[in-house]
């Protein structure tokens, strides 16, 4: 199966190709395309932004499309938000294809949370980071999705500070996806969607309290 990735940021666009070969998916995963999805947009607006890239991916012969979106600080239940965006996006995909499938994965809360989820990989980058144990104490076990990941990367960077794209490129060259997934539930979801070996099924979403209805 050929899978097309749609991402919502330049950092993911540049960095993910460095880790995709190590995901171990049995499928062919194409290099990502960027689409202008705003994290606080409605599900319908997110689907519209993603759908503008559907013809490009379908022309490349993809059988499935995976859309990666930052959740940021949205209070919506992640599972309900995924379902809402998938419903809207699948309606738009059906206009172009009756066979292609589609899945949505939210990065909780953003791409940097996946980058901090593999402290041993960060230790390899000794010229870039110090005090990696500070990161490890916060992300392990299974807590990477809940930390201020960008703040941690900046705080533990050596002289020169942390550059989002260059830093992500370096980290993704060292990142062990399965090791990182042990600390990130949202990354485990991506590995599951891509059918990567070692990807444990994520726990069913637990929605704490009643969130407001997710608008179209």
Please name every model-derived segment.
Residues 2-3, 13-38, 44-64, 70-216:
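C-terminal accessory helical subdomains adjacent to catalytic cores in phosphodiester-
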